[in-house]
């Protein structure tokens, strides 16, 4: 399902543990790390899609998590030109996402990356709050920044943790 602007409706999932560290997963067979995410089907609400994607990608069910909140609006990213499938109809130019902040209330041993085949991830770890912004693929970075900034007060009511700057690259001598 792609909207009239070419964006595929999608949900993103930020899962926190009790130490307020975030679930960070490695895409199978790649060195790319990301939060769980996935498309919203025509007959689904964003909340229903989030629970389905959570189960498919992590093996966790509603009994394992508490929904802390979600973004107010859709957050959009465009795909780089080389990833756009120009021969599909309609053409998908990117994703629009509602992001959910969850807290793990079950045991992390319940995480099963192989609960659905084919699996999307082959490894996962807990990371500091701002680390995903530095490690995610470049074209998703601004959406991660917006989602993390908007949802941080829900996880850190006493004040947002310090945001680490992205490393700068140097050119020339």
Swiss-Prot record:
Cofactor(s) this protein cannot do without: a divalent metal cation
Documented EC number(s): 3.6.1.-
Pfam families: NUDIX
Residues spanned by motif Nudix box: 38-59
Keywords: Hydrolase
Enzyme class name: hydrolase
Residue ranges of every copy of the Nudix hydrolase domain listed in the record: 6-149
NCBIfam families to which the protein is assigned, alphabetical: PRK00714.1-4, PRK00714.1-5
InterPro entries for the chain: NUDIX_hydrolase-like_dom_sf, NUDIX_hydrolase_CS, NUDIX_hydrolase_dom, RppH
Name listed for the protein in its UniProt record: RNA pyrophosphohydrolase
Amino-acid biosynthesis listed as a keyword: no
GO molecular function: pyrophosphatase activity
Gene designation per UniProt: rppH
Organism: Thioalkalivibrio sulfidiphilus (strain HL-EbGR7)
Reported function: Accelerates the degradation of transcripts by removing pyrophosphate from the 5'-end of triphosphorylated RNA, leading to a more labile monophosphorylated state that can stimulate subsequent ribonuclease cleavage.
Family as reported in the entry's similarity comment: Belongs to the Nudix hydrolase family. RppH subfamily.
Origin: domain of life: Bacteria
